Amino acid sequence: MKGYEVNFDGLVGPTHHYAGLSFGNEASTKNRNNLSNPKLAAKQGLLKMKALADMGMKQGVLAPHERPHVPMLRRLGFTGDDISVVAQAMRYSPELLSSLSSASPMWTANAATVSPSADSQDERVHFTAANLNNKFHRSIEAETTSQVLQAIFKNERHFVHHEALPQVALFGDEGAANHNRLGGDYAKRGIQVFVYGQQHLNNGLPGPKRYPARQTREASEAIARLHRLDDAHTVFVQQNPDVIDQGVFHNDVIAVSNQQVLFHHQHAFLNQDQAFAEIRQKMASIGEDFISIEVPENRVTVDDAVATYLFNSQILTRPDGGMTIVVPEESRQNAAVWSYLNDMIQMGTPIDAIQVYDLRESMRNGGGPACLRLRVALNETELNAVNPKVLMNDQLFMTLNQWVDKHYRDRLAQEDLADPHLLMESRMALDELTKILGLGSVYPFQK
């Protein structure tokens, strides 16, 4: 049976703003308090989705979350009607309101970890929503993420949804941003590579000193168990703590995979030779080669990789069998990175084409092309069981652009978050979106 990689991109929400909430993510911190343009951000994301669909890729849309998140504000002691709750929060703690108004769910690489049916012992696709324990503004996402995923992947014969891991540091889980799958055809067995930053139950192991390690080995192992993965086809690799301290807060800022290919920086992993030997041996066991494309430090520094999000790219297999790398405009603007990319496509690797997209609104908040998408490998039967209303086509692209034009502002500053009109605008937009995408009632305000 034919297999597909389906990319589900997050639609940027109406409260997209620059709050600098993500310690360890240098772009996020640097752009704190800048004016944002939610309308432009949403349209930039939609353009990328449509362009990839036009290339023949399977492309889906994940809905933004309800923001400001009034239920959490109520848990924190703010009272009255919803508009009063938001107004009180702005008066007493604008930073807290900003945190609970973040449009961070657009970065769906952190939404969940997904294991395809070909790898799972029960032959079903498994989803575990990420608890995102390391950052308060993201730790509230898992419940809505699960609701949205269950509205898209409904059929229990094909899809299994797990609760997020316990909301403690020991099981800090950042989803697919620290997970790669290597293999051949998307419908056949692959090797799942879980990348972690720290092992909490073994304090003697190295870890970062400047910035936090957001993914723990304990979390990755728990997900592998939940997804009923075979140890013989699963690998756990530690990310180099030195690069975490240079701003590589997720593995998808320093490495990206597709099928047999792992595109990565020279300094991406700890004990890299040993890790790659295990990957190579396990790939051989499923009859596949492992192709490592390593970018040396003397061509692209870690600092340049972080600044341009070279590795926060997408590698896509085109219908003709070749691979295209999708990079942000910032990669083209950096001479060293652009020179390397153009040399790479002449090296005889499977990657033979480059596509560049302007995602500046997302990039300024610290998220590139790979942050914006959740990869789901499906066979033909499973793809036919997906809610068809979320799959990108000409009509959906037009409808969503009109929806953005109708509901989104073209500038937003932190002080705007207390505007009662913004709360009502956002809810009206999301209520309409759930009908467009056929999601049902997935938001707290709808219940």
Curated annotation (Swiss-Prot):
Record-listed substrate binding positions: 19-28, 110, 137-138, 214, 252, 365
Disulfide linkage: none
Annotated catalytic residues: E174, H250, C371 (nucleophile)
Pathway where this protein functions: Amino-acid degradation; L-arginine degradation via AST pathway; L-glutamate and succinate from L-arginine: step 2/5
GO molecular function, one term: N-succinylarginine dihydrolase activity
Membrane-crossing segments per the record: none
Keyword Disulfide bond listed: no
GO biological process: arginine catabolic process to glutamate; arginine catabolic process to succinate
Catalytic reaction equation(s): N(2)-succinyl-L-arginine + 2 H2O + 2 H(+) = N(2)-succinyl-L-ornithine + 2 NH4(+) + CO2
Signal peptide: none
Hydrolase found in the keyword field: yes
InterPro entries: AstB_sf (IPR037031), SuccinylArg_d-Hdrlase_AstB (IPR007079)
Keywords noted in UniProt: Arginine metabolism, Hydrolase
Listed EC numbers: 3.5.3.23
Record text on subunit structure and interactions: Homodimer.
HAMAP family reported in the protein's UniProt record: AstB
Entry similarity comment: Belongs to the succinylarginine dihydrolase family.
Reported function: Catalyzes the hydrolysis of N(2)-succinylarginine into N(2)-succinylornithine, ammonia and CO(2).
The protein's name in its UniProt record: N-succinylarginine dihydrolase
Organism whose genome encodes this protein: Acinetobacter baumannii (strain ACICU)
